[in-house]
Structures are given as structure tokens and as C-alpha cells.
Amino acid sequence: MEPFCPLLLASFSLSLARAGQGNDTTPTESNWTSTTAGPPDPGASQPLLTWLLLPLLLLLFLLAAYFFRFRKQRKAVVSSNDKKMPNGILEEQEQQRVMLLSRSPSGPKKFFPIPVEHLEEEIRVRSADDCKRFREEFNSLPSGHIQGTFELANKEENREKNRYPNILPNDHCRVILSQVDGIPCSDYINASYIDGYKEKNKFIAAQGPKQETVNDFWRMVWEQRSATIVMLTNLKERKEEKCYQYWPDQGCWTYGNIRVCVEDCVVLVDYTIRKFCIHPQLPDSCKAPRLVSQLHFTSWPDFGVPFTPIGMLKFLKKVKTLNPSHAGPIVVHCSAGVGRTGTFIVIDAMMDMIHSEQKVDVFEFVSRIRNQRPQMVQTDVQYTFIYQALLEYYLYGDTELDVSSLERHLQTLHSTATHFDKIGLEEEFRKLTNVRIMKENMRTGNLPANMKKARVIQIIPYDFNRVILSMKRGQEFTDYINASFIDGYRQKDYFMATQGPLAHTVEDFWRMVWEWKSHTIVMLTEVQEREQDKCYQYWPTEGSVTHGDITIEIKSDTLSEAISVRDFLVTFKQPLARQEEQVRMVRQFHFHGWPEVGIPAEGKGMIDLIAAVQKQQQQTGNHPITVHCSAGAGRTGTFIALSNILERVKAEGLLDVFQAVKSLRLQRPHMVQTLEQYEFCYKVVQDFIDIFSDYANFK
């Protein structure tokens, strides 16, 4: 809104005056009546009109000034230089600022702690009406801006050190660096001390370093004796820089006076662990180097929150495990240092509260840490995610095991308290069957044209991770195949779980293998079992066969114990294209060790199959592995679960069969379909440990 126009104000005043003159019944007019004809003397009425109009003019002027100032503030917030996304949607930190301006002035509401036994019901109530109660609770939080001053953060020398102009540390909780001689305000960094559940200053919440502040960031890590950095953003999201890369990819680099050397880097599906050795490079420094672990959570999507809290809970446990008890505050940062950072800190604190008091008080804790750093937990979606993570933790607990305790755990799972109780294994599997099948996310598979492509209509892919084929020109629905991307232990979308091809979907199957550059096919069914078709034979016994634009030629077929290994030369050529034919070798591992009924008698065959597939992947590159049985869920899920579980056993000496299977069921319905298959997962792991424990460092 532009400044209130004086001409407009004058025009409005004149209208008021004319309205007053035109009213014949007013006392003012009657005072001017006279026995003499003619108009009244205008000079005589001026003092009275002036007294009437002055208050109106003053009121209008004050209103104009107020609206101009309000509009200016809103413009400053919304424009915020280049902090808009290309489509005009405001970034999270800007959404929060605008939202705070429109907050209801009514008094604060009170939200009480929730006993954990009531947590599921409370979340159900709050989630009704599109999470209306969650939004109400979130909008009742204090912003944190009122409780502190921001003088240091707003100093001219420090403004360029702030990534976002409206995300600043309070003066009373900011991290203070040692002053560098001759450099004013060199004690400033955009970072705040944040309490844990009961531990004061357990965390430092910081913005993602800018190029100009990397030296300060490492100075803070050294001076605060921090041993753990938690990173919750990617370097770029939506093509916008969220954090400057403040570490070397390899070797050493010096940031200011701190030398940082890479010691190790382990990439997992949800996060990456980097280990650095840091050491000050001052002439008179004789301090010993320190080891700093950076845990970088890479599964936070560009929009919203993670689809499931499982990955975050695993990540948080790893942070707790790696952080030494004697170390300084854990440094936590995202981009602004409030949204994802606050979410992580609140989940950690509330998990501790569950252990201590068997209840959670999310509202009170978020209110408290917003006094230390404004806007912690930035959106209602993040606020809701906290509750979802806490419910996941309460319902399923910590099911992770060290390999040395597996045998004892299996004994517990096979025991019962009374004859009427289910054994622990059945109860564990029952919890898995409670994982909700999200039918609302199966719209594509449920289209009539695509339902004809399903072997089992209950087992179709979710829309969010279905394998998408290129659309054939002029042919609708040809981008669909009943197949789902499934995460591996170290890599997202490492597997393509699919059904055994039908006669009319063989071409789609080979198109998928070709387009997604899959060099490995794992087949876990026979073509026929119990006189029923389970899978169309999609390869030639000899010579070659063509499906659409793809020709498959068999080059070799060898049987080793229970596994047939077939090598195919796959050729792709579009009939009307002038380009040369493209060829690729694809290897199929056909496992014959699965009986028609039940599960394999021992686990060695499955262990050998997984090892052979991994060796093939190392030679051909880590493109997706195509895995199928008949419906693409039971045996397929068991193979993928065991691949991920055994990979973790080898890498960490840890396993979590329950969460491994639960994660698969969130990606494709009915994965690991029966109690027998679930128990088989435990059996194979035990066999693996027994076979390799003599020369592997498991125990």
C-alpha cells in the first residue's frame, strides 16, 4: 500500500463538508436562517466546521500511517530478496514469519502432557479434519521473538553472516566465540544453545554455514569441544543453496586456523557418516587433535517431512551411540537452524521423557526452546511429524540387536508366558500386519486398464514409488507396470520388486529391465507350481525371442546347486529409428530352492544367492536389481529383507529384522507375506552368523 494520498484525504474531507451543508434539518443550518433572503455568510460557519473536521482528519491520518507501516513490514517479509522459490511459494522461514503476523491476539491456550498409553488416541483425535487440532496446537505456540533481544545479530558487521534475515539468535542464548584480535564482532555466529530434556545446553542449533562463516563454524566446534555434528539438509535443494560444503571430500583442508582431515565416510540409505580429525593451526598450539563425527541425514525431502519416521529414529539412535559422554554440545544444523533442527531436538528430548516419565509434553518443550531460539519447529507439518515419530517409538520400541544377542533373542521369541499367550514371534509378526495398506495411494494400479496387468489384485504398487515406464506414443497407460522401487541398505531404489510377468506384460517387463538399466534379475518361483501358472517364461530356452523393440538371446545356462544362472544378450532397436542397435548383458539368477509349499529347509541356499547377486552388482554397477516371485511380495520381500539385513550384519554387526520388514511393507503391500517367511529371516541370519563367525568380527 502506498502512502495515504493527501489529495484523496482532502477530497474525502470536502465530501464530508458538502454532506453537512446539504442537510436542511441540522441545527447548524437553522442557526443561519434570517428574515433577509439570500445565502448565509460563509465566513461565519468556518470555525464550527473546522472543529468538526479536525478530529476526523486526525483519525484518518493515523489510520493511513498505521496501514502504510503494516504494509511496509509485510513487503519486507515477503520480498526477502531472493528467498522465494521459482513457483512463488514462500520458504519455510518466511511462511513462519508471515504466519506470526496474522496470529490471533487471544491469550495462550494450555496443552497438557500426554501419558504414552493415550498417545495413539490423542494423535488420532488431533489428526481428524485434516489435522485441524494439530494446527491449532501449533499456532498456539509462542514465536520466541518477544522473549529476547537481537542486538548482536542485527549489527551491521553481522548481517551478512546470517543466512536468513528473520532467523536470528537471541542475545541471551547465542554461542559466543573467542574474539579475534582486530576484527570487530568476530565473536558472533548464528547459533544458539538449546537444552535437552534435562541436560542444559545439550545442543547447539546453528544455521547451515555460508561460505563467509565456515571458519567461524569450525572455530565454534573446536572451542565448544563438540564431537558430533548433525546435518539435516542437503547442500542444495530445489536448485537453491541450503548449506555451503564445510568439509573436504578427501584429504585435508584448513578453515581459518582449524585443519580438517577426512578419516572415513560411510554412505547408508538414509544418512552418511563422516569422520574428521580436527586440529588448530596456531603457532603456539600444542593441543591434541580431536575426532569429530558428522552424521548427515539425507532422506529429508525437499518438501514437507519424511514419509515415515523410521529412518529418523534409526539416525537419532546412531547419533546417541556415537556421541561421547564427555563431549561438548551436539551441533545440529539444517539451513536456517530452526525447522528440521528443532524437530530433531524435540524428538530426542521427548524420547528421553518417555523413558523417564512415560509421557510426552511436546507443546511445553517447544515453547521452552523457542525462548532460546525463536521459531524452533517451523511448520505444523514438522510439529505433527514429531508426534508420529514418538508414537512409532512407543509402539515398536527399539528392536535392534547385536549379533551376539540373536540366539538369546530367538529363545525369547519362541517362549510363552502362559499356554494362552501367543509366542513372541507371532506377536512381533502381528504388529507387522497392522501396518496400514494405503489404498488411497494406489490410484494408478487400480485403474481398470492396469488391474488387468495384475496377478493378484491386492498386490499392486503405491503411486509414490511405482516403477514408471516411458509412455508409448498414442497408447494410454503404457507407462504402468506392477513393480515398486525398494530401498537397499546403502542405496535408495536399489531393488525393483515386481510380479512374475503375464503373457501380455512380458514386453513391459523387458522394457523395465532395459529402461532402468537393470543388469541383474532374481527369480524366486518356478514357471509352474502345483499345476498353476506362476510366471510366464520370459526368456528363450535357445536362440532368441523378441518382445516389442527388445530382443533377448540366451548366451549361457548353467545350474549350480539350487541356482540356475542364465546370461542374456539384450538388444534394443526402435523400428523407425536410424540409430544403431544398443546391446547389454543381463544375468538372471533363478533360485530353485524354494519349495512349492512353505519355506526352504535351510538358509545356506539363500545366503549363496545373495552373495552371487552382490558379486554381479559389483561387476556391472549398482543399477536396480529386478526381483520377482509370482505376486512380487512374499518370497520377493523375504529376499530383499535378507539382502538388507545381512548387509547390515556384515557392516555393523547389528540387525533389526522387525524394522527391516516393516520398512518394506511401507514401500509395497504384503512384503514378507507369512509368519513362516518372517521366521525364515531370523533363521537365515542365524545360519549366516554360524557359518562366518569363525573368521568374521561379529562378536
From Swiss-Prot:
Record's GO cellular component terms: cytoplasm; nucleus; plasma membrane
Chain ranges passing through the membrane: 46-68
EC number from the UniProt entry: 3.1.3.48
Record note on disruption phenotype: Mice show greater insulin-induced tyrosine phosphorylation of insulin receptor (IR) and insulin receptor substrate 1 (IRS-1) in the skeletal muscle. Antigen- and IgE-mediated passive systemic anaphylactic reactions are enhanced. Erythrocytes exhibit abnormal morphology, increased Ca(2+)-activated-K(+) channel activity and marked perturbation of the erythrocyte membrane tyrosine phosphoproteome.
Region (Disordered): 20-40
Family matches, as Pfam families: Y_phosphatase
GO terms of biological process kind: cell surface receptor protein tyrosine phosphatase signaling pathway; negative regulation of insulin receptor signaling pathway; regulation of mast cell activation
GO molecular function: identical protein binding; protein tyrosine phosphatase activity
Residues exposed to the Extracellular side: 20-45
Top class in the EC scheme: hydrolase
Signal peptide, first to last residue: 1-19
Keywords recorded for this protein, A-Z: Cell membrane, Cytoplasm, Glycoprotein, Hydrolase, Membrane, Phosphoprotein, Protein phosphatase, Repeat, Signal, Transmembrane, Transmembrane helix
Ranges where the Tyrosine-protein phosphatase domain occurs: 134-393, 425-688
Post-translational modification: A catalytically active cytoplasmic form (p65) is produced by proteolytic cleavage of either isoform 1, isoform 2 or isoform 3.
Record topology, Cytoplasmic segments: 69-699
The UniProt record lists the keyword Lyase: no
Active site: C334, C629
Catalytic activity as recorded in UniProt: O-phospho-L-tyrosyl-[protein] + H2O = L-tyrosyl-[protein] + phosphate
Record carries keyword Transmembrane helix: yes
Subunit organization: Monomer. Isoform 2: Homodimer. Can form oligomers. Dimerization is increased by oxidative stress and decreased by EGFR. Isoform 2 interacts with GRB2.
Family membership: Belongs to the protein-tyrosine phosphatase family. Receptor class 4 subfamily.
UniProt free text on domains: The tyrosine-protein phosphatase 2 domain (D2) mediates dimerization. The extreme N- and C- termini of the D2 domain act to inhibit dimerization and removal of these sequences increases dimerization and inhibits enzyme activity.
Function: Isoform 1 and isoform 2 act as a negative regulator of FceRI-mediated signal transduction leading to cytokine production and degranulation, most likely by acting at the level of SYK to affect downstream events such as phosphorylation of SLP76 and LAT and mobilization of Ca(2+).
Name of the protein this chain belongs to: Receptor-type tyrosine-protein phosphatase epsilon
Species per Swiss-Prot/TrEMBL record: Mus musculus (Mouse)
